[in-house]
């Protein structure tokens, strides 16, 4: 796992943008709505080929209401994530973050490949892969709505 921090003065990160926009590289994350929105806004890019473990989990793990990353790591990897550092002050430079904060960041993503693989198998088994793919397309639309100032659900009555 890599921990990155773009230059806050101009947010130029051309090498990262190349990766984010590369359709051949899958970007895996958990609850990507705000991460993708922020990265696209600040880096002026269009992120391609994302896999959102929370959306996949909600579509294929219908036997539970627990779809947090902590729950997925426990079920698929047999590990307990310590989420206490999640509410830390993250508005610091990388050099100011503690070793515990840096470890927390890497722990948050190190299990995502296995979780993605297992969720993909479940989506196929449950015949929900196409529904997942449509949901990801809509996620991109939802992000565009967020970026345009429509923070409320426009489909809500």
Predicted regions and their residues:
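Conserved DEDDh/DEDDy metal-dependent 3′-5′ exonuclease domain
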Residues: 1-122
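Mixed-charge, glycine-rich, non-catalytic linkers/tails in nucleic-acid processing enzymes
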Residues: 91, 98-157
